[in-house]
């Protein structure tokens, strides 16, 4: 079954040699260029022109690719910030878990937290979760972060497409009797990164990762991610693209 129609941008000769060494037939369209920055530019241009619906990073630097992607001339940005959204299948949990943001926004302010929630809810909708339960994770201590989470929770209290609660601790967020959440919003990037990787390495879970908030889904898997995570991330990108990401942000 054909899921995507890939188009590769980069050094065609090197790609062919690598494919041959792996015993793989590279029977796909390749746009040849020896310059990785030019490859990034052409890939971004292809999604900007609607020739492609998903952007996936290959062997190029993330910073260089994103600096090109965010140029105003391509009109791929929206009013929201970009945030990393990961989707996890954990053997001990009865449904998928969406986590954000563990990879893009280092120390979000209130408006950025709103965007992070919006992006995560959008991904949850793409997964077929009509009214996701969103947990704003925290420790319960009285500090400025807790106050911000309370404000954030109240801002979403009249929404009909999601249920946002918090701040709430992780154990309550995952408890069937309490939260049984679909979406976990972490307080900062370090918590999101550690939580996401812990679910993969300690719980033997599966993960898919995308960057949401732009007019096309972006797949920025790291070199440490295995084939399964890359494949599942592509599937997630397809679901988001099919959900009409260009017209819903």
What are these regions (language model features)?
Residues 1-249:
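Anion-binding alpha/beta catalytic cores of soluble intermediary-metabolism enzymes, centered on
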């Amino acid at each position: 079954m054909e899921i995507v129609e890939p188009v590769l941008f980069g050094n065609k000769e090197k790609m062919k040699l690598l494919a041959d060494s792996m015993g793989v037939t590279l029977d796909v369209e390749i746009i040849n260029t020896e310059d990785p920055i030019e490859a990034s530019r052409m890939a971004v241009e292809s999604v900007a022109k609607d020739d492609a619906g998903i952007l996936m990073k290959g062997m190029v630097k993330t910073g260089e690719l994103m600096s090109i992607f965010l140029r105003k001339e391509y009109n791929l940005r929206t009013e929201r910030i970009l945030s990393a959204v990961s989707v996890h299948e954990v053997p001990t949990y009865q449904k998928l878990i969406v986590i954000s943001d563990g990879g893009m926004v280092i120390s979000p302010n209130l408006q950025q937290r709103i965007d992070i929630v919006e992006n995560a809810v959008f991904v949850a909708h793409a997964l077929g979760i009509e009214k996701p339960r969103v947990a704003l994770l925290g420790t319960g201590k009285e500090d400025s972060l807790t106050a911000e989470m309370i404000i954030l929770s109240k801002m979403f209290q009249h929404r009909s497409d999601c249920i946002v609660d918090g701040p709430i601790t992780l154990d309550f967020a995952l408890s069937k009797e309490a939260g049984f959440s679909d979406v976990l919003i972490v307080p900062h990037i370090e918590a999101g990164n550690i939580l996401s990787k812990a679910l993969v390495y300690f719980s033997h879970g599966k993960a898919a990762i995308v960057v949401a908030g732009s007019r096309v889904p972006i797949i920025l898997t790291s070199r440490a991610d295995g084939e399964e995570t890359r494949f599942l991330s592509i599937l997630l990108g397809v679901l988001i693209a099919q959900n009409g990401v260009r017209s819903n942000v």
